[in-house]
């Protein structure tokens, strides 16, 4: 990994480990699928990723005390997961996912409330509801990890902390 990116990633951990890390839909989906059934990584909706990508993601996210998300990301992640899995696998996955998404516990994902008035109209037009909501949440100083270059650029251009997972993959020699 390039030393400047590695230094930046370490700095982000130092500054955001207690507060947590905000994940976009594709990153959250990759993380959850890799934890539940790693052999699905590389399949539908996760075609561009391999197990080493999932390992890189998991290793980095472990540095943070909690995973932050929004209700929009949870809805998209749930819908995408339904496209990936069927039958008993899907039922087992959603039974496992329910407490993470819906029950307030130490292990559950932390939802960041986004008010409609906080979403920038221009970003909404360019990025849609889910990503403009993530951008609004990141403006509060939350560290965002995304695979979406447009979202990464939008957040970083506002001076908010953002990591592009593709850059991490490139630096780790996975692309």
What is each residue range found by the language model?
Residues 52-127, 132-133, 173-174:
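PIN-domain endoribonuclease scaffold, especially VapC-family toxins
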Residues 1-69, 84-89, 170-174:
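Short, well-structured N-terminal submotif of metal-dependent ribonuclease cores
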Residues 27-28, 73, 134, 150-152:
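Alpha-helix capping/helix-boundary segments
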Residues 1-18, 36, 119-123, 127, ...:
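Acidic, PIN/NYN-like endoribonuclease modules and their adjacent C-terminal/linker elements
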Residues 31-35, 78-82, 154-158:
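A short acidic (Asp/Glu
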Residues 43-48, 89-101, 146-155:
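Short alpha-helical "patches" and their helix-cap loops
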Residues 24, 131, 148:
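Acidic active-site catalytic centers that drive phospho-/nucleotidyl reactions
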């Amino acid at each position: 990994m390039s030393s400047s990116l590695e230094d930046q990633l370490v700095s982000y951990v130092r500054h955001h480990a207690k507060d947590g890390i905000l994940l976009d839909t594709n990153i959250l989906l990759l993380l959850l699928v890799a934890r539940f059934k790693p052999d699905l990584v590389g399949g539908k909706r996760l075609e561009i990723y391999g197990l080493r990508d999932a390992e890189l993601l998991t290793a980095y996210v472990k540095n943070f005390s909690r995973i932050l998300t929004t209700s929009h990301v949870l809805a998209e992640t749930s819908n995408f997961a339904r496209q990936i899995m069927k039958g008993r696998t899907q039922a087992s996955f959603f039974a496992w996912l329910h407490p993470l998404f819906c029950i307030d516990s130490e292990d559950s994902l932390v939802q960041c409330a986004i008010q409609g008035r906080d979403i920038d109209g221009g970003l909404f037009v360019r990025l849609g509801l889910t990503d403009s909501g993530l951008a609004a949440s990141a403006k509060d100083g939350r560290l965002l990890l995304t695979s979406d270059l447009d979202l990464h650029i939008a957040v970083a251009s506002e001076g908010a902390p953002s990591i592009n997972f593709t850059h991490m993959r490139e630096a780790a020699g996975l692309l």
